[in-house]
Regions:
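Short, positively charged patches
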Residues: 1-139, 143
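Structural motif
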Residues: 85, 151-154
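Catalytic cores of nucleic-acid endonucleases
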Residues: 147
Length: 155
């Protein structure tokens, strides 16, 4: 995925626009954050029913771009992968959700399109019993199904 598309997708996620579903709809119709931002001044040609809020958000992207540049620099420095929705690595099942995020961030080398995926969401204040339980659960799960992808919810 090219860095410009990643940067532009981060920009879209940082706009002061309160309808993520609307932004997702626009992204799916256009297929690229770069195309959206290149056509931001005439977005109604692409999306005739664009809301006034969307038009206002796209009219001023400077602050969102500054924040996105800082975020992308941080991601690159610390080896954090940014995956846009139009990237082949983006989880296909997640794309089917009406409220799928425009992008995901992760570290590692996991195939996010594994056949079997389990999400484990923990707590910020785990007890020793909970730590032991999840450690044994994950160990047993890996033996039963070695190809399972275990995703942390980062509670």
């Amino acid at each position: 995925m090219d860095q410009q598309e990643i940067l532009n997708t981060i920009v879209l996620t940082r706009l002061n626009y309160f309808s993520l579903a609307g932004m997702l709809d626009l992204y799916r119709k256009v297929g690229s954050a770069t195309t959206i931002l290149e056509n931001k001044d005439n977005i109604q040609d692409i999306l005739p029913d664009a809301s006034p809020k969307l038009l206002a958000a796209l009219a001023n992207t400077d602050e969102a771009r500054k924040r996105a540049e800082v975020e992308l620099e941080y991601d690159l420095r610390y080896g954090i992968e940014a995956i846009c929705m139009n990237d082949d690595r983006y989880p296909q099942r997640l794309k089917e959700c009406d409220d799928a995020p425009l992008m995901l961030f992760y570290k590692g080398n996991a195939n996010l399109n594994q056949q079997r995926v389990i999400n484990i969401v923990g707590t910020r204040h785990c007890t020793p019993y909970g730590e032991d339980l999840i450690r044994r659960f994950v160990s047993d799960l890996r033996q039963l199904c070695p190809q399972v992808l275990i995703v942390s919810g980062l509670a």
